[in-house]
Amino acid sequence: WRMVTEHTSTVIVMLTGLVEKGKKKCEKYWPDLGRRATYGQIALKTVDETHVGSYIKRMLEITSNGKMQFIHHFQFTSWPDYGVPVATSDLFRFHKAVTRIKTQKPIVV
């Protein structure tokens, strides 16, 4: 989270699920909807979560050193456990949703 706040990133893209074949694949690094979490001096809250077909879009509120900013968090949920998606249409829709957010800041993937 320090990297996100230092570079004032406004978009995070996640291309994996949390679990694959029953094994943890990725740590959940954001709190549940409406909840707050603290990571050192950084406070984080999930203020919105929308399931859109093959992805989830979240709005995160992050506060560090008295400064608050919002982060668009996109999680692609249709990547198969092994291999690549059979069709590319879901991935194209996901990409389009991400690129609709206009930013000059780094996108965290």
From Swiss-Prot:
UniProt catalytic activity: O-phospho-L-tyrosyl-[protein] + H2O = L-tyrosyl-[protein] + phosphate
Record carries keyword Oxidoreductase: no
Residues covered by the Tyrosine-protein phosphatase domain: 1-109
CDD domains tied to this protein: PTPc (cd00047)
Alphabetical UniProt keywords: Hydrolase, Protein phosphatase
Gene Ontology molecular function, alphabetical: protein tyrosine phosphatase activity
Gene3D superfamilies in the record: Protein tyrosine phosphatase superfamily
UniProt entry tagged with the keyword Lipid metabolism: no
PROSITE patterns for the chain: TYR_PHOSPHATASE_PTP
Highest taxon of source: Eukaryota
Enzyme Commission number(s): 3.1.3.48
Binding site for substrate: D81
The family this protein is said to belong to: Belongs to the protein-tyrosine phosphatase family.
Name of the molecule in the record: Tyrosine-protein phosphatase 16
Organism of provenance: Styela plicata
Originating gene: STY-16
